[in-house]
Amino acid sequence: MNLEELKKRQGKIRNFSIIAHIDHGKSTLADRILEKTETVSSREMQAQLLDSMDLERERGITIKLNAIELNYTAKDGETYIFHLIDTPGHVDFTYEVSRSLAACEGAILVVDAAQGIEAQTLANVYLALDNDLEIMPIINKIDLPAADPERVRTEIEDVIGLDASEAVLASAKAGIGIEEILEQIVEKVPAPTGDVTAPLKALIFDSVYDAYRGVILQVRVMDGVVKPGDKIQLMSNSKTFDVAEVGIFTPKAVGRDFLATGDVGYIAASIKTVQDTRVGDTVTLATNPAAEPLHGYKQMNPMVFAGLYPIESNKYNDLREALEKLQLNDASLQFEPETSQALGFGFRCGFLGLLHMDVIQERLEREFNIDLIMTAPSVIYKVNLTDGESMDVSNPSEFPDPTKIATIEEPYVKAQIMVPQEFVGAVMELAQRKRGDFVTMDYIDDNRVNVIYQIPLAEIVFDFFDKLKSSTRGYASFDYELSEYRPSKLVKMDILLNGDKVDALSFIVHKDFAYERGKLIVDKLKKIIPRQQFEVPIQAAIGHKIVARTDIKALRKNVLAKCYGGDVSRKRKLLEKQKAGKKRMKSIGSVEVPQEAFLSVLSMDEE
């Protein structure tokens, strides 16, 4: 293609993504757009086509982003090239959303006609506005009996401040309004602005590992052109590779002769190791490099940490490889090796949130076949020592001696909870119980309220989300962002079995709740740990002070069964002998801790 044609083609490209709260019909809308533009033949069509991971289909959520090229012939007779970049809607995957948005010029905002705006919708809209995207509101599910498009229209205008007068009323399920949406994309989404003649700059927004071709980069070309045979250079580490193949996704990978400015596609350059590529890096040509990289994504910092240990210790290396492969297309997963006396060798992993943690654990168990034990999740605490030093600690077993600690600060998040009016009381009670501080609340419409609290992240990490859903019959939606660190009265609680600390069961707790938390745990462990041949005390301790204790009674054989009648001293001798045996056993015996014991520390408030 000559320059003229490339520039003309660039004017026909539209890059957009779809943003929505969970279950507002984002993946279904993507399906309809694929069908309408005949990208996928009806034979290959299946619901939620872009959610290709089993886990995504089962949970009905989108986890990974996906990029597809479609051709659409508009009413003006021209054929346009659409790049649809599908994004997740869940709070833990915000970084996936920000990555998708960095590759786009426009965003379709899908809002459910019955439910209206939810917390996540807002969070994603703000991300889109940060990226200066053209936002097109669409009111979806208008075929539902409870749909009230006019109310939602005013909501979009009042709460977000977007002009919704031209918002398309659609039903992705019934296929209503799809054509209008496509026409609006052509009219409203701007064409890419890059320069074809400039040195190549392409943003890596994802990467996947292929056993045959190495690491395959998914890129959005911002400036210039890339084709097979070029020598590319990664700007973060200056490594160079030879391009073997470039192409696009129509969900399947299809090879192309080149990728030019505005294109979204993949580059295969036989990159062998996972560590060479970072999502958010800039690809340029080694022969004619760009002067400076694109500003990538802000590095996502993990907020939740937990230990992952293989149940079979010989699977340790498999677990490392699996984590490396997951890290390849999940840049926010961090891990480092750690050992525990109770669990052996494993990794300390950092996650963005609980759903992220859950999904990673499931992917490890499914895709890589590794059975795992996971320790209680914790957050990063700032510990200020008496000698003026300060340290960041995410693992309870690394906490310094209590006598050396001056103060401990913990992270607080600003939580936005959107909830129908009748549940406001329940939500406030829950937030108070989780040590939350009330900030403000405002009414979105006659019925829905946005309540804002400052809550310690450590309290949210446990089971806040489940509790919120159950106390509001599932109507609340919830979004949080890290706000600040505050000093708190925190203590580290150790659990002792038979006098020995079990490092994997230690956790950090607020001083005011320490006693009841300790009592709860020892009672719970008593039910779970099987009885031994000797008595096992279970203790909860803060430093050297025991705050709760319970004993697992010993199993004992009736040694007097063979003494029909007989002298009392004979009986006493047998009992003393048994007692001495038990004592000896106790001094050398070790207690097996079953898997459930570690999990019981997680699910604290179920009683």
UniProtKB/Swiss-Prot annotation:
PANTHER family given in the database record: TRANSLATION FACTOR GUF1 HOMOLOG, CHLOROPLASTIC, TRANSLATION FACTOR GUF1-RELATED
Pfam families: EFG_C, GTP_EFTU, GTP_EFTU_D2, LepA_C
A GO molecular function held by the record: GTP binding
GO cellular component: plasma membrane
Main location: membrane
Class of this enzyme: hydrolase
Annotated positions binding GTP: D23, H24, G25, K26, S27, T28, N140, K141, I142, D143
HAMAP family (alphabetical): LepA
Catalytic reaction(s) noted: GTP + H2O = GDP + phosphate + H(+)
Protein's job: Required for accurate and efficient protein synthesis under certain stress conditions. May act as a fidelity factor of the translation reaction, by catalyzing a one-codon backward translocation of tRNAs on improperly translocated ribosomes. Back-translocation proceeds from a post-translocation (POST) complex to a pre-translocation (PRE) complex, thus giving elongation factor G a second chance to translocate the tRNAs correctly. Binds to ribosomes in a GTP-dependent manner.
Keywords: Cell membrane, GTP-binding, Hydrolase, Membrane, Nucleotide-binding, Protein biosynthesis
Subcellular compartments: Cell membrane
Membrane topology: Peripheral membrane protein
Annotated ranges, domain tr-type G: 11-193
Domain of life: Bacteria
UniProt xrefs under NCBIfam families: lepA (TIGR01393), small_GTP (TIGR00231)
Keyword ATP-binding set for record: no
Listed name of the protein: Elongation factor 4
Gene source species: Streptococcus pneumoniae serotype 2 (strain D39 / NCTC 7466)
Family indicated by similarity: Belongs to the TRAFAC class translation factor GTPase superfamily. Classic translation factor GTPase family. LepA subfamily.
Enzyme Commission code(s) on record: 3.6.5.n1
Biological process annotations from GO: positive regulation of translation
